[in-house]
């Protein structure tokens, strides 16, 4: 690798290929993960145990040569366990700050819905502000700071569901899902002697990522596509069965993520296809459905799918 930032698309392609060495059959998930990372957001992975969520986060961190921390969320986890704490140093007769796991580049917040709302809020505020306040002192987080949170969609006993306002902090929510039987056989073969994570290293630098983020923000998007995004998000606010639609934050997130995806594809501009591909991962988790709609089987993804069919894309 050069010391100078690589071409942004080349950077993202190298990272994607490196992560896929470990996460076989998960190209679509890696694609969304990189769009969120490059777009400056955070992701919530919602899937069953054993689908590779932890491995995905570790592979991304290794590909960037980035700092990585994993934090298991439990009911007794405190905000100070995430943010850090000031401890009095008897020798120096002064308080010393001991940084918590949030001070890293890639943070895996495992089973975030198992912690209390107060503890969840401590992390989600850090995600939104890029800084934390401990004992009256504000401290900036390390850049880049990327959170990959997970939750199990099946188990609900002993969990604290994230409220809509907190879900809005995540640029995307998606489920990696199970790979095909053929890919699962290949995964078994890969792990006969050692874990594939041991065989990968850094293929890009944090400076390369910073360059990719700048390039993504500069990807052109036509005025009619901005209106298309606003129309899609706006329709969720009046959709049947929706108590609370997506906020303008969803519009901004969809634009930023679509720009990042266009960069990953090597496109010179955002297309309707980029917006449509990311609409559900960006918007669906932000919708609050009324109880009757949920009981009848309506989902946030279903609402977004209906909106995409109802709103014509610009030619």
Located regions from the model:
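C-terminal engagement/docking regions of AAA+ P-loop ATPases
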Residues: 2, 6, 236-315
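Walker B catalytic acidic pair
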Residues: 47, 110-111, 122
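P-loop (Walker A) phosphate-binding loop of NTP-binding proteins
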Residues: 48, 82, 150
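Canonical AAA+ ATPase core
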Residues: 89-94, 115, 119, 127-219, ...
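Conserved alpha-helical scaffold flanking the Walker A/P-loop in AAA+ ATPase domains
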Residues: 31-35, 88-108, 137
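Walker A/P-loop
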Residues: 37-74
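Pre-Walker A (pre-P-loop) alpha-helix and adjacent loop at the N terminus of AAA/AAA+ ATPase modules
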Residues: 7-48, 230, 234
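AAA+/P-loop NTPase substrate/partner-engagement loops
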Residues: 63-91
């Amino acid at each position: 690798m050069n010391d100078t930032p690589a071409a942004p698309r080349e950077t993202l392609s190298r990272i994607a290929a490196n992560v896929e060495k470990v996460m076989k059959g998960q190209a679509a998930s890696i694609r969304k993960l990189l769009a969120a990372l490059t777009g400056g957001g955070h992701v919530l992975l919602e899937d069953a145990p054993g689908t590779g969520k932890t491995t995905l986060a570790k592979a991304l961190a290794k590909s960037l040569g980035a700092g990585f921390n994993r934090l298991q969320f439990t009911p007794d986890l405190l905000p100070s366990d995430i943010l850090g704490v000031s401890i009095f140093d008897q020798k120096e007769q002064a308080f010393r700050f001991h940084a918590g796991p949030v001070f890293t580049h890639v943070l895996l917040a495992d089973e975030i819905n198992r912690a209390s709302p107060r503890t969840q809020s401590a992390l989600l505020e850090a995600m939104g502000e890029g800084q934390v306040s401990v004992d009256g002192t504000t401290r900036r987080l390390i850049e880049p700071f990327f959170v990959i949170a997970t939750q199990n969609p099946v188990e609900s006993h002993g969990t604290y569901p994230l409220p809509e306002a907190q879900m809005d902090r995540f640029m995307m929510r998606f489920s990696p899902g199970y790979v095909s039987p053929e890919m699962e056989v290949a995964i078994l073969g890969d792990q006969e002697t050692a874990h594939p994570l041991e065989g990968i290293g850094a293929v890009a630098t944090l400076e390369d990522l910073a360059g990719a983020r700048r390039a993504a923000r500069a990807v052109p998007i036509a005025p009619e596509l901005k209106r298309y995004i606003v129309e899609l998000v706006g329709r969720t606010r009046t959709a049947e069965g929706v108590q609370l639609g997506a906020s303008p934050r969803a519009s901004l997130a969809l634009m930023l993520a679509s720009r990042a995806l266009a960069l990953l594809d090597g496109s010179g501009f955002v297309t309707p296809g980029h917006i449509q591909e990311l609409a559900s991962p960006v918007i669906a988790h932000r919708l609050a459905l009324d109880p009757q709609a949920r009981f009848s089987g309506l989902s946030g993804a279903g609402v977004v799918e209906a909106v995409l069919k109802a709103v014509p894309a610009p030619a």
